Amino acid sequence: MISREANIAFEPATAKAYRVLEHMIVTLELAPASFVTEGALIEKLALGRTPVREAIQRLAWEGLLDVRPRAGIAIAPLHPGDWLRVLDARRGVEVVLARSAARFVTREAADLFHEAALAMQKAVISGDVLAFIQADKALDDALALAADNPFAARLAAPLQTHSRRFWFRYKADTGLAESAEHHVALIRSILDGDEEAAAKDAKRLMALLRGHAETAATR
């Protein structure tokens, strides 16, 4: 079994730059609506200009950064109502991925699902929100691998990142156990090879997130 940690240890510099910057955006280390320079990010990540620049370009395409000539790089703002829009776009593709994952899940993907579920449960017990966020990302990566549908996976990935960022901002203080329960149910259905149950659990997870988003939008 090749763990996610092992994969990370050998990842290309551009992929590492993307992963680190994405995490900084999701966890609000790069504050919403703030500005940063490319030079500051290159210095912070210590990965070289080209990998960081390529990661910035990808994050800009995904709507998480806005590169403004002579002004710097703007971190995407967080408007509560946008969480609902993200979830409306995400719901259908998550069902597609869940069904496909249940149909095509491999041993490698199953191992990654088990690893993500265990990490998520440990994060709940310890109340470690950052560890939970990382486990959620690992689960999404396992789902993309298991589904064997790169078109759906590429569509889902930025929506998952945006949603994770909203969740961290508006629900991380109270939502760990309930969120983990829904994620683990989805994993179980996928590993059972039950396409209908996996689709149903994906819809339940999206409904849970939508409830959180509706609450955030009316605060």
Task: Show the residue positions of the predicted features.
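Residue-level recognition of alpha-helical structural elements
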Residues: 82, 105-109, 128-132, 148, ...
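Hydrophobic packing residues in well-ordered alpha-helices of helical domains and bundles
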Residues: 86, 113, 132, 136, ...
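Short linear motifs at protein or domain termini
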Residues: 1-103, 210-219
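Hydrophobic alpha-helical segments typical of transmembrane helices
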Residues: 21, 51, 82, 139, ...
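Hydrophobic, amphipathic alpha-helical faces that serve as interaction scaffolds
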Residues: 89-105, 137-173, 212
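C-terminal all-alpha effector/ligand-binding and dimerization domain
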Residues: 9-13, 114-121, 126, 168-219
